[in-house]
């Protein structure tokens, strides 16, 4: 900053010299304030090359380089001199098997070998064909007398002999053929009154009501509507028919199916004899079954639902019926 003030003073003084003939030197002025920083100068020239630095520490080993290309085969070296025999070295490791060599030529035929031992007996061969017929041999000597031959055929009938004496009386002959039917005889006397024949009877027909429809499963169905049960062979309290007359019976059942599927079985003494099933679709369906059975005294028959409450669609109301019937065809007494 001082340099700028100095230059300014010199410029003023020079102006005054031009305007006046003489100039007196004044007192030094007050130093001015420092000026602003000048612009950066240009880069200097490169200096001289410095001394060689110390050797750096060894770097980390580099990764192995790629294998170089194989060199050309060298020329055969000169034969070595034969030296004294060295000490026998240790046995080397076994080398890998070499490749199979080419097949050798066939050698000359060897001499005949010695006879071998007799081998075991072979299996029996198949039967050979029949050979040709040989020439007829000479006639042999006469053999011993043979046994007596069988009787010869019957000879012709001889002449009739003289009449013999009368024999004894023979047995009575078989009855003769039945004769022609005779004339109708007179009316006989009236007989006595016979005993009245009483035929055994057993029959029933029962049905369901509004109260007993949709019965429980796996138990006898208790039909509470009595259509015919004169001899009380069907027990409405337990839902079973009991045989009082041994014989052959006919059983049948008619079912109105509504709202649910139906699956029932006709049971004899706990054994299911006849099965009927109907899948309900819409409106009302009908299902039935019938059978003829031989029963003994005391046998029990009943109808029951099987398969659970999904199959108890047996229906009854004022216009629809579900019935169970059984009756005796003939007795075996």
Curated annotation (Swiss-Prot):
GO cellular component: collagen trimer; extracellular region
Organism name: Homo sapiens
Protein purpose: Probable adipokine. Activates AMPK, AKT, and p44/42 MAPK signaling pathways.
Record domain Collagen-like: where: 24-82, 95-154, 155-191
Domain of life: Eukaryota
Record note on quaternary structure: Interacts with CTRP9A and ADIPOQ. Forms heterotrimers and heterooligomeric complexes with CTRP9A.
Annotated gene: C1QTNF9B
Leader sequence segment: 1-19
Positions of region (Disordered): 24-189
Ranges of Basic and acidic residues composition bias in the record: 42-55, 69-88
Protein name, entry field: Complement C1q and tumor necrosis factor-related protein 9B
């Amino acid at each position: 900053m001082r340099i700028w003030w100095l230059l300014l003073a010199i410029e003023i003084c020079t102006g005054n010299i031009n305007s006046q003939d003489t100039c007196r030197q004044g007192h030094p002025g007050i130093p001015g304030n420092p000026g602003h920083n000048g612009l950066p100068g240009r880069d200097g020239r490169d200096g001289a090359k410095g001394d060689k630095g110390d050797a750096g520490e060894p770097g980390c080993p580099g990764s192995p380089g790629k294998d170089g290309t194989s060199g050309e085969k060298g020329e055969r070296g000169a034969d070595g001199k034969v030296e004294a025999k060295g000490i026998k070295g240790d046995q080397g490791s076994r080398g890998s098997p070499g490749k199979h060599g080419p097949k050798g030529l066939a050698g000359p035929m060897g001499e005949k070998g010695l006879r071998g031992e007799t081998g075991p007996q072979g299996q029996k061969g198949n039967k050979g064909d029949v050979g040709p017929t040989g020439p007829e041999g000479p006639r042999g000597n006469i053999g011993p007398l043979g046994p007596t031959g069988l009787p010869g055929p019957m000879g012709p009938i001889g002449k009739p002999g003289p009449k013999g004496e009368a024999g004894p009386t023979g047995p009575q002959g078989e009855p003769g053929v039945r004769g022609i039917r005779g004339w109708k005889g007179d009316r006989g006397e009236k007989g006595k009154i016979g005993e009245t024949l009483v035929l055994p009877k057993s029959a029933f027909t029962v049905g369901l009501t509004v109260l007993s429809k949709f019965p429980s499963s796996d138990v006898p169905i208790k039909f509470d509507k009595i259509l015919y049960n004169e001899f009380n062979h069907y027990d409405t309290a337990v839902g079973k028919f009991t045989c009082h007359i041994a014989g052959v019976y006919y059983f049948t059942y008619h079912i109105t199916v509504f709202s649910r599927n139906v699956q029932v079985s006709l049971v004899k003494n706990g054994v299911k004899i006849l099965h009927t099933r109907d899948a309900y679709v819409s409106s009302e369906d009908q299902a039935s079954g019938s059978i003829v059975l031989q029963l003994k005294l005391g046998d029990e028959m009943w109808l029951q639902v099987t398969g659970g409450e999904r199959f108890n669609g047996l229906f009854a109301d004022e216009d629809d019926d579900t019935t169970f019937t059984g009756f005796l065809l003939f007795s075996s007494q």
